[in-house]
Amino acid sequence: MSLLALGINHNTASVALRERVAFGPDCIDRALRELVAQPGVSEAVIVSTCNRTELYCSLAQGQGEQVLQWLQRFHGLDAAEVVSAIYQHQDEEAVRHLMRVACGLDSLVLGEPQILGQIKQSYAHAQQSEAVKGSLERLFQKSFSVAKRVRTDTEIGASAVSVAFAAVSLGRRIFSDLSQTKVLLVGAGETIELVARHLREQNVTQMMVANRTLQRAQLLAEEFGAQVMTLEEIPDYLHEADIVISSTASPLPIIGKGMVERALKARRFKPMFLVDIAVPRDIEAEVDELSDAYLYTVDDLQGIIEQNLETRKRAAAEAELIVQEERDDFMGWYRSQHSVDLIRDYRHQSQQVADEELQRALLALQQGENAEQALKALAHRLTNKLIHAPTQALRHAAAQGDHHQLAQLRQMLGLSQES
């Protein structure tokens, strides 16, 4: 048996191709059942996210091409469409690849933690479809523990490397407990949505969403339990906000110095933290002149991100060493499983020989043969049959002049070294 990792990701395939190769919730169970029904495939897990689709299989040697052909058939793809984007890893490299993916070392954003949850969900699907057991089950459990160790023993996830995460991280520098703050989000696009998710992870429950169109803001508000307002209503509510994070496509500033100054007076000059992620700016630069307003722009965040990315790169180097160590540990276990099968088969074969010769000896005794002669014959035949295969191997190695194999056979048979 062999382990296989086969797939495409953001480094090898366009978004258009990744969309065509993806496995959605509506087809994942059927796909798993079909995959494990392929000749030689005993286990399978399918990991499918926006940035990658990967098939992990335990299968007979040389069956990787069959898995690739199944993938093409399932999605109705021509070989020419995927051949340049597909990568395949076997055994040690397949193990290393999965562990790196689980740790976020192969992600578009180095060290991002979301991929681990996605892999766990994929593994759960495989369990529900009874598509995973044995070696592949052990590999995924091992990969989860490796990812946890990397998170614990390195700083791979300690620093913000996205604009949204950096904005929230800056807020924590000013307000140690974000759960006690009220946040105004200006805009309702993808970046603001990601900011809202990070805020929720920090237990922020008081959010306001201001947007040019209320429909999009309401969708965001429903998900995060936020209050909704138009951009024109911001002056009426700005004083309630401890934190303001803005990201719109407005060509002109939405929040001016005078508006913030009035809000600070209403707050009795309690500090206000503002992050302007937009280009061009949503918040007038002069706001930074106010003593109780702390304004950061996307340029400030970029500097933090670049500094943090260097920290993550150093942590990633440490993580790679952990992955290598854990891969070797898993492969030691995996190879030992092959010896378990071999030992079982060898014992079964030897037991069959012993049973046959025992029955032959008992029959001889029943027919009146002398007991001593019957036992001597039993010992002679049993010895000859049990040493036949090793003897043939020794003769073949000697005939080939293979001294290395002869030494290995001598050690295996427990023979003392030649004088």
UniProtKB/Swiss-Prot annotation:
InterPro entries: 4pyrrol_synth_GluRdtase (IPR000343), 4pyrrol_synth_GluRdtase_dimer (IPR015896), 4pyrrol_synth_GluRdtase_N (IPR015895), GluRdtase_CS (IPR018214), GluRdtase_dimer_dom_sf (IPR036453), GluRdtase_N_sf (IPR036343), NAD(P)-bd_dom_sf (IPR036291), Shikm_DH/Glu-tRNA_Rdtase (IPR006151). It catalyses: (S)-4-amino-5-oxopentanoate + tRNA(Glu) + NADP(+) = L-glutamyl-tRNA(Glu) + NADPH + H(+). Keywords: NADP, Oxidoreductase, Porphyrin biosynthesis. Its EC number is 1.2.1.70. Gene3D superfamilies: Glutamyl-tRNA reductase, N-terminal domain, NAD(P)-binding Rossmann-like Domain. The keyword Ligase does not apply. The active site is at C50. NADP(+) binds at G187, A188, G189, E190, T191, I192. GO terms for biological process: protoporphyrinogen IX biosynthetic process from glutamate. It holds the Pfam family GlutR_N. Substrate binds at T49, C50, N51, R52, S107, E112, P113, Q114, Q118. Catalyzes the NADPH-dependent reduction of glutamyl-tRNA(Glu) to glutamate 1-semialdehyde (GSA). Belongs to the glutamyl-tRNA reductase family. Possesses an unusual extended V-shaped dimeric structure with each monomer consisting of three distinct domains arranged along a curved 'spinal' alpha-helix. The N-terminal catalytic domain specifically recognizes the glutamate moiety of the substrate. The second domain is the NADPH-binding domain, and the third C-terminal domain is responsible for dimerization. Homodimer. This is Glutamyl-tRNA reductase. It comes from Aeromonas hydrophila subsp. hydrophila (strain ATCC 7966 / DSM 30187 / BCRC 13018 / CCUG 14551 / JCM 1027 / KCTC 2358 / NCIMB 9240 / NCTC 8049). The gene is hemA.
